[in-house]
Amino acid sequence: MYQVDINCDLGESFGQYTIGSDEQILEYVTSANIACGFHAGDPTVMRKTVRMALEKGVQIGAHPGLQDLVGFGRRPIAISAEEAYDLVVYQIGALSAFLKAEGSTMQHVKPHGALYNMAAKNTELSESIAKAVYHVDPSLVLYGLSGSELALAGERMGLQVAHEVFSDRTYQTDGTLTSRREPNALIEDDELAVQQVVRMVREGKVHTVQGEDISLKADTVCIHGDGIHALQFAKTITSKLKEASIRLKAFQ
């Protein structure tokens, strides 16, 4: 039987601002990537999200991003490899403390937004991020875009790597995600998104916006928690994957 991890970016509320339906979405995912205060989240939200995920039996990972609350960490910012290393170590440490306080441990690390996309193409940045994860805890799993520089850097570093695919994003022929600045970046039709995921998991293929099929590895599927239809989509995709005889299981 085919199996795949379903991960979601959570804990992205902060202060008086509520983003997403974290508690409900946790019913449908196997792994949670929790924001660590730079692109979103705050200490109280981090603590509450950790507790909710533990109560649901969901694996927990750090979701470090660029220090850009206004841009939600989705705007590219020029940073050095050293700065990338420092901000990843810092944010892993912050979430690790909350997990330790709850008597638990972290399972993985997945960079957020622009940091994730920059590292997917930039060897120097990707190596710094992989090194940061390895130096904090070599047993952590690194989540990276399938086949990207980040995933390859993690493997070279000796980390276990989960090659990630996206349910609601379109792909370019080089395996990267279509920029959110483009009108065709998002897949808003649930049925099309489900079809894309099932094919990626079962066949290791995805159809690009250029009209070509490319190969990729699908260890984990990302669903975004900040969209207005996120909860309904989480319900739909988990139900349809099970109907397609695909087992939902946290990455190990």
UniProtKB/Swiss-Prot annotation:
First-tier enzyme category under EC: hydrolase
Q: Which domain of life is it from?
A: Bacteria
> Under which EC number(s) is this enzyme classified?
3.5.2.9
Q: What does this protein do?
A: Catalyzes the cleavage of 5-oxoproline to form L-glutamate coupled to the hydrolysis of ATP to ADP and inorganic phosphate.
Q: Summarize subunit and interaction data from the UniProt record for this chain.
A: Forms a complex composed of PxpA, PxpB and PxpC.
* PANTHER family the record matches: 5-OXOPROLINASE SUBUNIT A (PTHR30292:SF0), UNCHARACTERIZED PROTEIN YBGL-RELATED (PTHR30292)
Question: What are the GO MF terms of this UniProt record?
Answer: 5-oxoprolinase (ATP-hydrolyzing) activity; ATP binding
The record's gene field reads pxpA
Q: Name one GO biological process term.
A: carbohydrate metabolic process
Catalysed reaction, written as an equation: 5-oxo-L-proline + ATP + 2 H2O = L-glutamate + ADP + phosphate + H(+)
Name the UniProt record assigns to this protein = 5-oxoprolinase subunit A
Pfam families assigned: LamB_YcsF (PF03746)
Cite the entry's keywords alphabetically.
Answer: ATP-binding, Hydrolase, Nucleotide-binding
Family per UniProt?
A: Belongs to the LamB/PxpA family.
